[in-house]
């Protein structure tokens, strides 16, 4: 086992604070409308330019192991805030730095660290409740656009695009961000249910100009099996041909004789058919087939429940107003499934989302809800260079998370004002003893830090502006972009309550642990083995 280096008390805390400050100082230059960019060197490819706090935090590793421990613990604050609300990482880092710096001063002055932590925790619990009372619901497009604009570093086009996307696909819809091909940002909305599977044979194409299969009012056959024998399908094909409607087959696979016969029938015009593979794999495929069945009012033909393809009738088939299939995707528009059945299915999937343990599973389940309940919108980010594209895409992602958080828990006045008002409201809060009271004061003083940092980044004097804001009340604050005072809501400067709440909770959680640290242990650097030089022997 490697030898360890151990530091105690003040020595440990000073080192830890130095690491915290290096990371926080790098992150906090990005805060606010006049925050600056940070350039990150990559081991391969061009450097990345970012104004996203968590991207900066993730890049920082310090040489001194004790300092690095401090930095890594604050990195955890940024990551947790990012996971919870998707934004507010810089605010969380600034809050953590302020609580740690003030807290360690109190420890050095002889306060009991455990009581300080209890005081900080008490102040944060009260602050979260106060934030909830200040919170205003965010439901109209204008407020959503404002939240998106602020989170995308005052880029109005991004805010408007996100608000438009939410209008089109609803609050539950899936909105994804992709690389665009031009210089302008675009919004693409897919109505209906789309999945990533294309036609199994190009001979199904009936719109050569677009290279797609478009079928009006088709029947939809859903089968949880491979279809290779055409005899199994004859009864269904005959019934569909009599009804004079096209047929879409969605199955595990359609191959061999069955596929060849379907192609021949289509080319001769006997019955219009198109076949695609079912989306997903394994259990997810079964679930997605069931989703399509619910949407189209059909039944999944599955041997697991004793159904055979030969015995399928028109009643077992789903229907939709239109189905469009191209090389890579299939879109089902206006399925005829009952609204009550679709809502029931959505509720069932939401329950699974609550119980999901992995982020990947949760994301896939949310996609399924969106496909059933709303639709899918794609924001295509335009930029002149790849470096700009990456930076802008990260900002759009942040803005998207912020707007979702705003819709979920409402909004409060932005620009650090909400936390200043909360701190003023809690000024009379007391605890069991003097050390805990100091802990409360540490937390309340730290709540001014985001406002001060925004002002500092704008090149103004933080103390003057902070005093002016504290002298006002309600949503009165300082607009760092235009350098004027006024009502933050009227200025359109809003922060999602969830983002502010998460930033405060995670910052206090990690800062409380660091204040109570008394000893730090790390591996001693390994000294390289001495070079033995060349072995003696006969000369050549």
From Swiss-Prot:
One of its GO terms (molecular function) is isomerase activity. The keyword Transcription does not apply. ATP binds at residues 30-33, 51, 87-91, 415, 479-481, 495. One of its GO terms (biological process) is protein refolding. Its EC number is 5.6.1.7. GO terms for cellular component: cytoplasm. It is an enzyme of class 5 (isomerase). Gene3D superfamilies: GroEL, GroEL-like equatorial domain, TCP-1-like chaperonin intermediate domain. It catalyses: ATP + H2O + a folded polypeptide = ADP + phosphate + an unfolded polypeptide. Pfam families: Cpn60_TCP1. Keywords: ATP-binding, Chaperone, Cytoplasm, Isomerase, Nucleotide-binding. The keyword Nucleotide-binding applies. It is found in: Cytoplasm. Belongs to the chaperonin (HSP60) family. Forms a cylinder of 14 subunits composed of two heptameric rings stacked back-to-back. Interacts with the co-chaperonin GroES. Together with its co-chaperonin GroES, plays an essential role in assisting protein folding. The GroEL-GroES system forms a nano-cage that allows encapsulation of the non-native substrate proteins and provides a physical environment optimized to promote and accelerate protein folding. This is Chaperonin GroEL.
């Amino acid at each position: 086992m490697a030898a360890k280096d151990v530091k105690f008390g003040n020595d440990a805390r000073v080192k830890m604070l130095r690491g915290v400050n290096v990371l926080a100082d790098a992150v906090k230059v990005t805060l606010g409308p006049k925050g600056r960019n940070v350039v990150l060197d990559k081991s391969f490819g061009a450097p990345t330019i970012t104004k996203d706090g968590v991207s900066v935090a993730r890049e920082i590793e310090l040489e001194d192991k004790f300092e690095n421990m401090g930095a890594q613990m604050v990195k955890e604050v940024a990551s947790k805030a990012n996971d919870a609300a998707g934004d507010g990482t810089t605010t969380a880092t600034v809050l953590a730095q302020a609580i740690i710096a003030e807290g360690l001063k109190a420890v050095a002055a002889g306060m009991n660290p455990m009581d300080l932590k209890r005081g900080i925790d008490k102040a944060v619990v009260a602050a979260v409740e106060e934030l909830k009372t200040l919170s205003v619901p965010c439901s109209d497009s204008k407020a959503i656009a404002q939240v998106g604009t602020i989170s995308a570093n005052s880029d109005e086009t991004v805010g408007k695009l996100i608000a438009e996307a939410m209008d089109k696909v609803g609050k539950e819809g899936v909105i994804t961000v992709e690389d665009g091909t031009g210089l302008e940002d675009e919004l693409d909305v897919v109505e209906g249910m789309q999945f990533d599977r294309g036609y199994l044979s190009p001979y199904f194409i009936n719109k050569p100009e677009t290279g797609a299969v478009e079928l009006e009012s088709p029947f939809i056959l859903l089968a949880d099996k491979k279809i290779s024998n055409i005899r199994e399908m004859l009864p269904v094909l005959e019934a569909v041909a009599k009804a004079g409607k096209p047929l879409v087959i969605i199955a595990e696979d359609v191959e061999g004789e069955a596929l060849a016969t379907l192609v021949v029938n289509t080319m001769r015009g006997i019955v219009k058919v198109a076949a695609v593979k079912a989306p997903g794999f394994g259990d997810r495929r079964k679930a997605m087939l069931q989703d399509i069945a619910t949407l189209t009012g059909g039944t999944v033909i599955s041997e697991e429940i004793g159904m055979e393809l030969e015995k399928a009738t028109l009643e077992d088939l789903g229907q939709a107003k239109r189905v469009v299939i191209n090389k890579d995707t299939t879109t089902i528009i206006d399925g005829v499934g009952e609204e009550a059945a679709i809502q029931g299915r959505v509720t069932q999937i939401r329950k699974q989302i609550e119980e999901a343990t992995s982020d990947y599973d949760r994301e896939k389940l949310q996609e399924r809800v969106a496909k059933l309940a709303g639709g899918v919108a794609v924001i295509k980010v335009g930029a002149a260079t790849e470096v700009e594209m990456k930076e802008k895409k990260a900002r759009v992602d942040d803005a998207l998370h912020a707007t979702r958080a705003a819709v979920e828990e409402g909004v409060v006045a932005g620009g650090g004002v909400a936390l200043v008002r909360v701190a003023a409201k809690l000024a009379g809060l007391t605890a069991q003893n003097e050390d805990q009271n100091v802990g409360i004061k540490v937390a309340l003083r730290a709540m001014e830090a985001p406002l001060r940092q925004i002002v500092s980044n704008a090149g103004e004097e933080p103390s003057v502006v902070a005093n002016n804001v504290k002298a006002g009340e309600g949503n009165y604050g300082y607009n760092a972009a235009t350098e004027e005072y006024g009502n933050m809501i009227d200025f359109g400067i809003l922060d999602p309550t969830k983002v502010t709440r998460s930033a405060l909770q995670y910052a206090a959680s990690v800062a409380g642990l660091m204040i109570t640290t008394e000893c730090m242990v790390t591996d001693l650097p390994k000294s390289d083995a001495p070079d033995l030089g060349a072995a003696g022997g006969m000369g050549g």
